[in-house]
Amino acid sequence: VLYKNEVLLCARNKKIDARFLLGLMKQESSFRSNAKSPAGARGLLQLTYDTALKYSTAAGYPNLQPEDLYRTDINIAIACIYIAELLKKFDGFYEAVAASYNGGEDNAERWLKRTNPNDKGVFVAEIGFPETKNYVLKVMVNYQIYRQLYDENLKSYSNRMQEKSR
């Protein structure tokens, strides 16, 4: 698993499923730390400088510069604080977190309000931006694949099976 130590550290500290972080990272940058979007988002988790500045001091980087977002440790640490805030805001609902991460918090809140609280499976259908809807579906598929491959400590299920058979 690429960036396993950084992902696990952040996931444990912020109570985020590490496999969700991997799913988000795969979709955002295909695990390329040097990725840069046309909108200027940078690094593994494609943070914009403005968003990163909101969380940089809490992450221990009060003098953050835009180029720092290409450093995997910094990018993951800042994104984790942001994602943890979104998880709290959306009551642990990962689909809404992904929608917010891509389409904005206000939009995700609006889409969630149109969803029956007892039927959150309908949430993705309520997403008003085709790009964000597609993004959420891809992130959640990535997340489910990582849940099939790894436990919460990112240990491969197949490796554990091999160890047990020895």
Locate predicted features.
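Catalytic glycan-binding domains that act on GlcNAc-containing polysaccharides
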Residues: 1-166
